[in-house]
Swiss-Prot record:
Its EC number is 3.1.21.10. Belongs to the RuvC family. Its cofactor is Mg(2+). It is an enzyme of class 3 (hydrolase). Mg(2+) 1 binds at D8, D139. The gene is ruvC. This is Crossover junction endodeoxyribonuclease RuvC. The active site is at D8, E67, D139. GO terms for molecular function: crossover junction DNA endonuclease activity; DNA binding; magnesium ion binding.
Length: 173
């Protein structure tokens, strides 16, 4: 059993989603958004750090998965996003959580089956995969999708490692 915290970083709204994985079974534990209503960036970063730390304390995840930075058209926005990611990652590292990063395209490909999927498609598939009664908020859905992606990627890595181990054992005999 593993608990995964997914984070969709943003300097104004940071989505989070927490799921439990037992084998191939995924269970929704919680999700939401950290909203920073203050104007100055340092105060927003402090709120993101405090919010992520609180979520980690509440859910006690085993893994921390976050979206990678994409190249934005606006350099200022990309820098602010990078800083928001940074404080979220520091919150995880301070709690000694292993950090995994996934590209937005990989997340959409994993959850929807199309790397260029729309936000509404991600919301719908997250709702379906986690058997939720309604679509989660967009940022929370993205965070849940990141957590789901981590589950699928880690499951595939474990299967590949097991196959290689079995192959190596076969060669050693």
């Amino acid at each position: 059993m593993s608990i995964i915290l997914g984070i969709d970083p943003g300097s104004r709204i940071t989505g989070y989603g927490v799921i439990r994985q037992v084998g191939r079974q995924l269970t929704y534990l919680g999700s939401g958004c950290i909203r920073t209503k203050v104007d100055d960036l340092p105060s927003r970063l402090k709120l993101i750090y405090a919010g992520v730390t609180e979520i980690i304390t509440q859910f006690q995840p085993d893994y921390f998965a976050i979206e990678q930075v994409f190249m934005a058209k606006n350099a200022d926005s990309a820098l602010k996003l990078g800083q928001a990611r940074g404080v979220a990652i520091v919150a995880a590292v301070n709690q000694e959580l292993p950090v995994f990063e996934y590209a937005a395209r990989q997340v959409k490909q994993t959850v929807v089956g199309i790397g260029s999927a729309e936000k509404s498609q991600v919301q719908h598939m997250v709702r379906t995969l986690l058997k939720l009664p309604a679509n989660p908020q967009a940022d929370a859905a993205d965070a849940l999708a990141i957590a789901i992606t981590h589950c699928h990627v880690s499951q595939n890595v474990m299967q590949m490692s097991e196959s290689r181990l079995n192959l190596a054992r076969g060669r050693l005999r």
